[in-house]
């Protein structure tokens, strides 16, 4: 309801400008910070892949997407997490192929 300055009717009341409230801290709950993302990527780069992640990539290489999803679901617990992991591993595989193809051509 927007006040019109009239003292009768549905929109009665004094006209005021609404103050902009600062965002509440609970609105950023669950959102990963830039620093955390950077650190996680660094750790992934240094530590490499877990054995189950290697298995998923092997399954994706031979085109067994459904089996890869099942392996991921078994390890991670939920279908949603498994789908995200499968997509992550397939994107890693895609990057390796595109990066690897360029590197092998340069060697020749």
UniProtKB/Swiss-Prot annotation:
Ranges of compositional bias, category Basic residues: 75-84
Q: Which domain of life is it from?
A: Eukaryota
PANTHER family cross-referenced by the UniProt entry: 60S RIBOSOMAL PROTEIN L36 (PTHR10114)
User: Which InterPro entries does the entry mention?
Assistant: Ribosomal_eL36, Ribosomal_eL36_sf
Gene Ontology terms: cellular component: cytosolic large ribosomal subunit; plant-type vacuole; plasma membrane; plasmodesma
Q: Which family does it belong to?
A: Belongs to the eukaryotic ribosomal protein eL36 family.
Provide the protein name: Large ribosomal subunit protein eL36x
- Cite the GO molecular-function annotations of the record: mRNA binding; structural constituent of ribosome
Show the segment(s) annotated as Disordered. Answer: 13-34, 75-108
Lineage of the source organism? Answer: Eukaryota, Viridiplantae, Streptophyta, Embryophyta, Tracheophyta
Q: Which UniProt keywords apply?
A: Ribonucleoprotein, Ribosomal protein
Q: Name one GO biological process term.
A: translation
């Amino acid at each position: 309801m927007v006040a019109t300055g009239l003292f009768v009717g549905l929109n009665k009341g004094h006209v005021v400008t609404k103050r902009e409230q600062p965002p509440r801290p609970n609105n950023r709950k669950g959102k990963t910070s830039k620093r955390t993302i950077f650190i996680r990527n660094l750790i992934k780069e240094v530590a490499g892949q877990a054995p189950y992640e290697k298995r998923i990539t092997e399954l994706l290489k031979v085109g067994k997407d459904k089996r890869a999803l099942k392996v991921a679901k078994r390890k991670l617990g939920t279908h949603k997490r498994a789908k995200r992991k499968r997509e992550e591993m397939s994107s890693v595989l895609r990057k390796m192929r595109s990066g690897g193809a360029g590197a092998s051509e340069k060697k020749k």
